[in-house]
């Protein structure tokens, strides 16, 4: 039986970023590979968000159903308009307050985003993380990285690179070890495709914080967290 290769590991901090390793990670992502990396919430399992084959690799590595949408990570607010067709005013207000940060917004997707990335939906989940390592990697990869949590489905979301290596070390190409994440709690997901914003997943940004900014907000009780 063919022996699986262990992921390449690069260690760095937000204060001392390894530019060569970031460039290497960016090339892996551009070429359809998978790179795990730190964000302020949990470690993400990254693939090129605009490459349908890369998105399918993410589903396979996680053992995740392919109809479960992936979150697209950006590192420049100006890149949002390329992957969505509309940004409601309330979404822009929330982004101004909480981006970069642990907020994911669901918006109508542009044609450039493949259905494999969105789980077949006409909307796309987008986040602008505040972690500097994540931002540098996303930019090196071309600006759009699909990244759910870097764990096999059903396991806890990883807060260290060691967790990722133990779980996915033989299924992915590279792990960027940025140490312990700052928050350790998933991003809050808010759907802006309806008239009233809907919280699909509670997270670091609380319902009270959202209502302070948006006013009326609903919670989807049926949503799978």
Q: What do the PLM-derived regions correspond to, one by one?
A:
Residues 2-225:
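Active-site-adjacent structural elements in enzyme catalytic cores
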């Amino acid at each position: 039986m063919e022996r699986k290769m262990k992921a390449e590991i690069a260690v760095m901090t937000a204060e001392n970023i390894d530019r060569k390793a970031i460039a290497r990670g960016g090339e892996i992502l551009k070429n359809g590979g998978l790179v795990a990396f730190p964000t302020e919430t949990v470690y993400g399992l990254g693939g090129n968000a605009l490459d349908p084959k890369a998105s399918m690799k993410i589903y396979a590595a996680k053992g995740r159903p392919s109809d479960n949408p992936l979150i697209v990570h950006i590192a420049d607010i100006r890149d949002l308009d390329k992957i969505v067709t509309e940004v409601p005013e309330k979404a822009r207000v929330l982004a101004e307050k909480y981006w970069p940060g642990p907020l994911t917004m669901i918006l109508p997707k542009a044609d450039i985003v493949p259905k494999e990335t969105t789980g077949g939906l006409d909307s796309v989940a987008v986040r602008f993380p505040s972690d500097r390592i994540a931002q540098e990697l996303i930019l090196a990869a071309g600006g759009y990285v699909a990244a759910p949590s870097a764990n096999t489905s059903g396991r806890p979301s990883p807060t260290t690179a060691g967790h990722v290596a133990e779980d996915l070390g033989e299924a992915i190409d590279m792990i960027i070890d940025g140490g312990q994440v700052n928050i350790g709690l998933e991003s809050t997901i808010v759907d802006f495709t309806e008239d009233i914003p809907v919280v699909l997943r509670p997270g670091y940004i609380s319902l009270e914080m959202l209502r302070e900014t948006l006013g009326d907000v609903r919670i989807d009780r049926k949503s799978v967290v």
